[in-house]
Amino acid sequence: MTSEELLQKVRKIEIKTHGLSRNIFAGEYHSQFKGRGMAFSEVREYQPGDDVRSIDWNVTARMNRPYIKIYEEERELTVMLLVDVSGSRNFGTVSQMKRDMMAEVAATLAFSTIENNDKVGVIFFSDKIEKFIPPKKGKSHVLHIIRELLSFEPENSGTDINAALQFLINAQKRRCTAFLISDLMDPKFTSGIMVSRKTGVPTVVIASRKHDLSAIQIYDRRDAEMPNVGLLKVRDPETGARVWTDTALSSVREAYAKAWQDQQEALENVYTKTGMNHVSIRTDEDYVKALMRLFKQ
């Protein structure tokens, strides 16, 4: 797209998503995410009735009497958006491609963040980390994020959610609120293969323990069901492989639908094990209602 077309598209998304963030989501965001984080404030001498789990043993040893750590609510949050830029985002059969809805959802979350005076950053990932935008405040920063959401083209086309989560773990030392925005079409995300080399614990488990992690699945109707249109040449958007498929065969359509259902059940298993909040949004659905459901979980 030309620079002028990009500018017009940025402006269109800004008007739509900034209004949603300010008028609808700001209050929900504040009540859901503010106050979840606790930051170290000071140490003071232990008093009867204090929680012994808060004892600072290093200070206690130096002072030769017990001291405890005092924590207070963090007034400022950092929000990280993990945005899938793999080849499968360029698929869409109804009203828009998945990448378009991902951009709007991410922009809405970004504007909600700055409306509450918090910082927002972005990790673009395929089967590697494609781009990292460090968290900052301010409208100009969000507009920069929107431009990247609309125009960024990745080097690779595969998907590795593990890489994105591991980067988040390494890059964000303090607890943050993170949204994984993807079609979640990565088998490693739902299998035991995706583990940390250090601990042997699945990376998604480590990430959800360290950070407040939510999953937003963006998918197309045809991701879940195959139409009956006869012979169809199907291309895998991530591997580039092309095969002829006879969609008139009910067995083919049923196998396709079952593969989708199996994937969704595997995702539910991940959510159950990690306690992650999550929502699925189809590209022809209203994402506003879906985000409201997510904020109220």
Predicted regions and their residues:
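An amphipathic, basic-hydrophobic helix/alpha-beta surface used to engage anionic
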Residues: 1-135, 177-182, 187-188, 194, ...
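Conserved phosphate-coordination/catalytic loops
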Residues: 100, 155-162, 258-261
